């Protein structure tokens, strides 16, 4: 007995089912898929079938909630701003546009300045939010804080105002509509 004489047991290996090869094969014409319908078309597979086993999407619990009006806030520490100033990446005034480019943020982001780190530069920083410690450190160094009210995307959509001005003007309050009372 040698390796070349080894064969699988009789009946252990089944031949491949060749479908769609004429009526004599028993699986011609419709190739065992029945007549018409989505299941007979090519490319059809049932999504997430696990063959009678409880599928994953039903085994796992539902959880969480995504608020529709969630604000995306990018946080920047004063130590980071100080580093940018020392490297010469920003000047005397740091705008929301500067923060966007230096943080690789999107146009929908709000920016919050946090007070971590040392800060000795007298600069004007424009951002949407400031922590109390950040305001104290900036003013102690001789700088100013300017609050922006809109994201870059919102400011670009304001008609009749220059971009920089649109950033800094507060949004108009949303007025609630009064319900009309039915007179009958």
From Swiss-Prot:
Protein name: Large ribosomal subunit protein uL15
The keyword Ribosomal protein appears for this protein: yes
Role according to the record: Binds to the 23S rRNA.
InterPro entries: Ribosomal_uL15 (IPR030878), Ribosomal_uL15/eL18 (IPR021131), Ribosomal_uL15/eL18_sf (IPR036227), Ribosomal_uL15_bac-type (IPR005749)
HAMAP family on file: Ribosomal_uL15
Organism of this sequence: Chlorobaculum parvum (strain DSM 263 / NCIMB 8327)
Keyword entries, A-Z: Ribonucleoprotein, Ribosomal protein, RNA-binding, rRNA-binding
Assembly behavior: Part of the 50S ribosomal subunit.
GO-annotated biological processes: translation
UniProt keyword Ligase, yes or no: no
Family: Belongs to the universal ribosomal protein uL15 family.
Region of interest called Disordered, as start-end residue ranges on this chain: 1-62
Composition bias, Gly residues: 21-35
One Gene Ontology term, aspect cellular component: cytosolic large ribosomal subunit
Origin: domain of life: Bacteria
MF-aspect GO terms: rRNA binding; structural constituent of ribosome
């Amino acid at each position: 007995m040698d390796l070349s004489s080894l064969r699988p047991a009789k009946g252990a290996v089944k031949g491949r089912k060749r479908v769609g090869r004429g009526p004599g094969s028993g699986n011609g014409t419709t190739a065992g898929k029945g007549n018409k319908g989505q299941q007979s078309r090519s490319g059809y597979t049932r999504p997430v079938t696990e063959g009678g086993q409880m599928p994953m999407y039903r085994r796992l619990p539902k959880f969480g909630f995504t608020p529709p009006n969630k604000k995306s806030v990018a946080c920047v520490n004063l130590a980071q701003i100080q580093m940018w100033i020392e490297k010469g990446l920003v000047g005397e005034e740091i705008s929301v546009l500067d923060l966007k480019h230096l943080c690789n943020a999107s146009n929908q982001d709000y920016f919050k300045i946090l007070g971590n780190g040392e800060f000795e530069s007298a600069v004007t920083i424009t951002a949407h939010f400031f922590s109390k410690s950040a305001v104290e450190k900036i003013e102690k160094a001789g700088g100013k804080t300017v609050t922006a009210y809109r994201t870059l995307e919102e400011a670009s959509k304001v008609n009749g105002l220059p971009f920089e001005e649109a950033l800094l003007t507060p949004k108009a309050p949303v007025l609630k509509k009064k319900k009309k009372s039915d007179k009958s």
